[in-house]
Amino acid sequence: MDDNTGTEGGACSESERAGGWFIVEAIVDRRTGDPISSDDDEEEDEAGEDFVDFIDDTRSLGDGQEVAQELFQQQTAADDDVAVQTVKRKFAPSPYFSPVCEQASIEHELSPRLDAIKLGRQSAKAKRRLFELPDSGYGQTQVDTESGPKQVQGSSETQDGRQDDDEGSVVQSTLDTGNQNGRQNNDEGSGRNVGEHGSQEEERAGGDGEESDLQSTSTGKGAGGVVEILRASNKKATLLGKFKEQFGLGYNELIRHFKSDRTSCADWVVCVFGVFCTVAEGIKTLIQPLCDYAHIQVLPCQWGMTVLMLVRYKRAKNRETVAKGLSTLLNVPESQMLIEPPKLRSGPAALYWYKTSMSSCSDVYGETPEWIVRQTMVGHAMEDAQFSLSEMVQWAYDHDITDESTLAYEYALIADTDSNAAAFLSSNCQAKYLKDACTMCRHYKRGEQARMSMSEWIWFRGDKVQGDGDWKPIVQFLRYQDVEFIPFLCAFKTFLQGVPKKSCLVFYGPADTGKSYFCMSLLRFLGGAVISYANSSSHFWLQPLSEAKIGLLDDATSQCWNYIDTYLRNALDGNQICVDRKHRALLQLKCPPLLITTNINPLTDERWKFLRSRLQLFTFKNPFPVTTQGEPMYTLNDQNWKCFFRRLWARLSLTDPEDEEEHGNPSEPFRCVPGQNARTI
């Protein structure tokens, strides 16, 4: 039985009950301005007390009020969503803007009326998208849908089922009164008004990639053929993928990477995309005046023509120079180029260039680079040999190299012409070979020096000097310093002969008189060694004297003279001394002749009276003369010292060397490799 709570009487009709629709018309008892008596107030107060429970607030199911409340809640929720979307606009992804202006720009989408009053469409700057939508897992694929006047019905949903509400969209809801549960179906009733000129929608292609294929087909015509490159977030990855698709191998398998664009190289591997057909054919001729070798392949693709080149320029160029030059020749931007140097020691890479050069799809100009020939020709492959340490030692000995860093650099430079140097670079023990080679070279040099007398050593050092000089600047400089030449020559003769107590020359004088300049030039010619008193606290500071024919102690002070007077009297005598060498046993040897420069006269100080008989002193009084350009007025170089010794060879009582022109060289040149010297018959 239907019991309608809140109604009195059961004989009323359905229209008179609270569950139906009815119209209530108010009855006006008083008008505005009518006087109100106290009786009326009392009646109102009494009526309020009497009719407290007159209105029934209880709601019965099925009376239709839940539909109105549901509608009100939905409208309130829609208004709240619009307000939140307006406040947090920066968290929503920006509308997509086509970089080639094939669709309407963002300003035109947001304000179609503003676009309508313009005389012509303006090119707008590309807008940066703030946030990316979640991808399906197959890459950042973007598709631009058609733009035009249309009305979108229904709701746009993302892949996770949430409704995609754009800013400024109008939510249109309809009430479904026939629904028993009173709920609204948003999927069928909601929609979005796009506008008069339509809008650009950015969509994500799914795993099948059908929409992406359609877009690439539509943009592959005319000027939009390289739109895919422009839109790609990683343009280089797009070009590398297209290269592997066309040529069947990776671009990185043919090249080595240069991080800097300023690194120079003569050989370059260049791949250019989107070249016009006529230009691609013309580059085969235009590139020839610029290079010594060119290997060019031209293949068609949907972007245009793809040009792959292996080029050896006549002069070394960096990546920026190569890109600018080819951009001018091919009329293609640098963003459509891959430019890297080739792999010079990769057999598969060299074989690829060799095999493709013989095919009909390649055009080759010039002589094949040696790094391709060396790795592909059978004759060159047979010539590859194992590394020989003795050959490296012989090369270091012939070029007078005993420093490890210098030997490593110089020997690597000849790897293109020397098979042993190439084998050295291919070895995994380069550091060990380098250290061993320098050690052996120093041993050979030390043994050769110890075998020679002073006369032979001076002649040997003179043969290493290229060119002839003049001995007169040396004599003129001594006269400028008021040094008598004949007494100096006599003292210098006994100095070279190592006569006891005559094997130390001291050059005394004030500063800037040329003492160190004179001694250093002589020491450089004779290949001597320098010792420094600053290292006197070490037991090994005299070790360089064991490996030299002559020594130099520059700028001796009072403390240094005290040390010499205390510990080095026998060294100045030219007698046998004992030298401590680091990590090696003590060595007993005769001290070589020693040059000393000082600002203190040791002959006038009573503290060093026992050194007076062991020193031969020469005084430099005058400042060293220089020209207006700052150059020394008296040039003391190796050529002048060579001429000085050859000119005064007999006066210095040096032994005459054997006549090599008439009698030939009595001894063969030193060889540290097995085999015999090749002699002519």
Swiss-Prot record:
**Keywords in alphabetical order:** ATP-binding, DNA replication, DNA-binding, Early protein, Helicase, Host nucleus, Hydrolase, Isomerase, Isopeptide bond, Nucleotide-binding, Phosphoprotein, Ubl conjugation
Q: Look up the coiled coil feature and give its residue ranges.
A: none
| Amino acid composition bias (Basic and acidic residues), ranges on this chain | 185-207
**Where is motif Nuclear export signal found?**
110-119
Q: Does the keyword Transport apply?
A: no
PROSITE patterns xrefs: SF3_HELICASE_1
Q: What Enzyme Commission number(s) appear in the record?
A: 5.6.2.4
Q: Top enzyme class of this protein?
A: isomerase
- Polar residues compositional bias: what residue ranges? 138-158, 170-184
Indicate where this protein resides in the cell.
Host nucleus
What GO MF terms are annotated? ATP binding; ATP hydrolysis activity; DNA binding; DNA helicase activity
Q: Quote the PTM field.
A: Phosphorylated.
Where is region (DNA-binding region) located?
Answer: 218-384
The UniProt annotation puts motif Nuclear localization signal at: 88-90
Biological process according to GO: DNA replication
Return the HAMAP family for the record.
PPV_E1
Physiological role: ATP-dependent DNA 3'-5' helicase required for initiation of viral DNA replication. It forms a complex with the viral E2 protein. The E1-E2 complex binds to the replication origin which contains binding sites for both proteins. During the initial step, a dimer of E1 interacts with a dimer of protein E2 leading to a complex that binds the viral origin of replication with high specificity. Then, a second dimer of E1 displaces the E2 dimer in an ATP-dependent manner to form the E1 tetramer.
Q: Which family does the record claim for this protein? A: Belongs to the papillomaviridae E1 protein family.
Q: What is this protein called?
A: Replication protein E1
In its UniProt entry, the species of origin is given as: Human papillomavirus type 10
Q: Gene of origin? A: E1
